C-alpha cells in the first residue's frame, strides 16, 4: 500500500483555502462598518491542529490598524458563522493581521526606479 505523504498538509491547505473564501464572503455581507474600508483577504495560515488561523488582509480606504481592530473585534462572530458553514471537527480561532507586503513592494519598486534614474543621469 503506498504511503500518503503530505496528505495532512494538503488537507491543511484545502481547509485554509475554504476558510479564506468563506470569510471573504462573510466579511463583505455581514460586517457593515464604513471605518473598515474595502478588505481583501490575502492568505490564511492554519496551525497543524486547526486550533488557530492567521488571516492576512489588505485594506483600501481605511487605516490598517482600524480595520484590524474591527476584524479582531468581530472574530468571535465570524467564527460562529464559519462554524455553521464548515464541516470540520475544529473551527479555528481567528486572528486578523494586516499584510503590508503590497506597500513594501511598491516602495521597493519606487526605490529601484529612483536608483535607475539616478544611474542613467550619471552616465
UniProtKB/Swiss-Prot annotation:
Coiled coil: none
Localization per record: Cytoplasm
UniProt KW Cytoplasm keyword: yes
Predominant cellular place of this UniProt entry's protein: cytoplasm
Single GO biological process annotation from the record: maturation of SSU-rRNA
SUPFAM superfamilies in the cross-refs: Ribosome-binding factor A, RbfA (SSF89919)
Superkingdom: Bacteria
Keyword annotations from UniProtKB, A to Z: Cytoplasm, Ribosome biogenesis
InterPro entries in alphabetical order: KH_dom-like_a/b (IPR015946), RbfA (IPR000238), RbfA_dom_sf (IPR023799)
An example molecular function term from Gene Ontology annotations: ribosomal small subunit binding
Signal peptide limits: none
Gene Ontology CC annotation, any one: cytosol
NCBIfam families in alphabetical order: rbfA
PANTHER family: RIBOSOME-BINDING FACTOR A, CHLOROPLASTIC-RELATED (PTHR33515:SF1)
Reported function: One of several proteins that assist in the late maturation steps of the functional core of the 30S ribosomal subunit. Associates with free 30S ribosomal subunits (but not with 30S subunits that are part of 70S ribosomes or polysomes). Required for efficient processing of 16S rRNA. May interact with the 5'-terminal helix region of 16S rRNA.
Family the entry assigns: Belongs to the RbfA family.
Protein's recorded name: Ribosome-binding factor A
Record organism: Ralstonia nicotianae (strain ATCC BAA-1114 / GMI1000) (Ralstonia solanacearum)
